[in-house]
């Protein structure tokens, strides 16, 4: 049984409305993300102005994001490799 033209238009309209809503939400979130990125940049600039090494700060943040066990395993492997190379 074929869909009636009215039903097809309604479905198309609903899909278009949903698509528009999704696109607008993504655009709004992208704007927020850009704003947050600017805020983060400002905090790093403040840290640098106060004498902190921003590369080290970024590394610490990266480390804190990871699971404790995963971090310990990576540190153990790093230590092993450094010993093998006579670096410690």
Swiss-Prot record:
Pfam families linked: GapR_DNA-bd
GO molecular function, one term: DNA binding
Source domain of life: Bacteria
InterPro entries per UniProt: GapR-like, GapR-like_DNA-bd, WH-like_DNA-bd_sf
Gene3D superfamilies reported for this sequence: Winged helix-like DNA-binding domain superfamily/Winged helix DNA-binding domain
Entry's family note: Belongs to the UPF0335 family.
Protein's recorded name: UPF0335 protein M446_5200
Organism: Methylobacterium sp. (strain 4-46)
């Amino acid at each position: 049984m074929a869909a009636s033209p009215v039903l097809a238009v309604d479905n198309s309209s609903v899909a278009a409305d949903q698509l528009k809503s999704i696109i607008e939400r993504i655009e709004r979130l992208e704007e927020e993300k850009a704003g947050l990125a600017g805020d983060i940049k400002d905090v790093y600039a403040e840290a640098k102005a106060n004498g902190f090494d921003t590369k080290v700060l970024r590394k610490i943040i990266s480390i804190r994001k990871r699971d404790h066990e995963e971090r310990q395993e990576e540190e153990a492997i790093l230590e092993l490799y450094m010993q093998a190379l006579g670096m410690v």
